[in-house]
Amino acid sequence: MFPNRKTAAMDRLAFLHDSLFSPIERHLDGLVPLLARFVFAATLLMYFWSSALTKLGDGIMGIFVPSTGAYAQIFPKQMEAVVYDVSQLSIFHWAVVVAGTWAEFILPLLIVIGLFTRLAALGMIGFVVVQSLTDLYGHGGIAHAETLGAWFDKVPDSVILDQRAFWMLILVTLVIKGAGALSFDRILSRQILGAPATA
C-alpha cells in the first residue's frame, strides 16, 4: 500500500517537472547559444582584440609586420635565444605570429555576429589551447601553482584550469549548438540554402 502511494507521488512529481520544464526546453533551447555569444562578447571580445592590437607593427603594414612584442608573446623562449632580434627568426615564426594576430581579430568577431560560428568557435578552442600551453611552458606559468590552478579545490580563479575552463565551455556550447536564432548563420541558411543553420 505505502509503496504504491510513494510511486504515485513520484509520478505526480515527475509529471509536474516535465510539465514545467519541457516547454522551457522546447521553446527556449535556441536561447542557449545566443547567451553564450553574448557572454563571449561581454567578457572576451575586447580581451582578444586588445591582445591582438599589441601584436601589430607600425603603420598600415603592421598587419603583415608584427611588433617585436608579438614574437615575444608567442615564441618567448626563441626570442630569448636570439636576444629579441626578430631578423634571426624564420618565416615559420612570422607566419605563425601573423596568423595568430589575425585569428585574434577575426574569430571573435565571427562568433559575436554569428557567422560560421561553429568553425570560429572550433578555431578559438585551438587558439586557447595553444595560448594556455604557451603561458604554461613558454612564459613559465607551470612553475606557479596559482597560475595553473586545480579543479575541485576552494580557489575558483586560477588563470588556466579555472578561468579557461569557462572559456572552453562557452566555445564548446557554440560548436555543439551553433549560433542560435539571431545570427548571420541563420540568415544565410534560410535565405540562401533554405535549410536550418549548421555553421
Task: State each model region's role.
Residues 2-78, 87-106, 113-199:
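Extended, low-polarity transmembrane helix blocks
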